[in-house]
Regions:
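Mature extracellular or lumenal effector domains of secreted proteins
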Residues: 1-225
Length: 225
């Protein structure tokens, strides 16, 4: 076996046309392993401004491994979102007693909308780079709808650390036809309760994403205000 900086190759003695079988190191991709993989949805968009909302393979430098995650770069102008959890109604009971500050990784290597959650270290790293959190319903089938939806600043609702039962400030919240902007509403997350609001039954909001800001987007948002 021959090894270069970003790839390892095995000689194929029985194949005259293809003499080597080469694989890239986890951090690299491309035909010649010349491209460094993104470590976040934000970095993916920065590397390729034409990136669309879809599942990407990202590189985790802590564990030197790849994982799959859905990056949303298109649904809300000025935002790029990293999906940290998704589950169907059928699977909601499996998540009902799992607050975000406790580890419960599921299908990180083979993404599925019906049952997915990043590991606790990966969620914490994502949150530390981010400014907002949101929850949506049926995003994979209906795209973004502002019914059964909330968005808040992580400085107000830090889902990765908050053990809380009380009122918190939201930028926007809409639950079963009731909505308000820049207002307070109930938020609950306890050691054996998944994050939720009292306005709706646990499990009706089932897609949670964290926003990673890009400098040019923050500047646009300030000008619009």
């Amino acid at each position: 076996m021959r090894q270069w900086r970003h790839l390892a190759c095995t000689e194929l003695f029985e194949d005259a046309k293809n003499k080597f079988n080469c694989t890239c190191a986890a951090e690299y991709c491309g035909r010649f392993c010349q491209k460094r993989r993104a470590t976040s949805c934000k970095e993916q968009l920065q590397k390729n401004r034409g990136s669309r909302s879809r599942v990407y393979q990202l590189f985790d430098p802590t564990t030197i491994s790849l994982y799959e995650v859905f990056c949303d770069a298109n649904s809300e102008k000025g935002f790029v979102w990293t999906l940290i959890e998704s589950f169907s109604r059928r699977n909601k009971n499996e998540f009902a007693n799992k607050p975000f500050y406790k580890g419960y990784p599921i299908t990180q290597d083979s993404f599925t909308w019906s049952k997915f959650r990043l590991s606790l270290p990966r969620m914490i790293v994502t949150a530390n780079r981010s400014t907002h959190v949101r929850a949506t319903c049926n995003f994979n089938t209906e795209e973004l709808q502002y019914r059964d939806y909330f968005r808040a600043k992580l400085s107000e609702i830090d889902v990765m650390r908050l053990n809380f039962d009380g009122c918190k400030k939201y930028e926007f919240i809409s639950i079963r036809g009731y909505n308000c902007a820049n207002c307070t509403a109930h938020f609950v997350q306890r050691d054996f309760w998944h994050a939720h609001q009292y306005w709706f039954a646990l499990g009706s909001i089932d897609r949670v994403s964290i926003y990673q800001p890009i400098r040019r987007c923050r500047e646009v948002r300030r000008r619009r205000r």
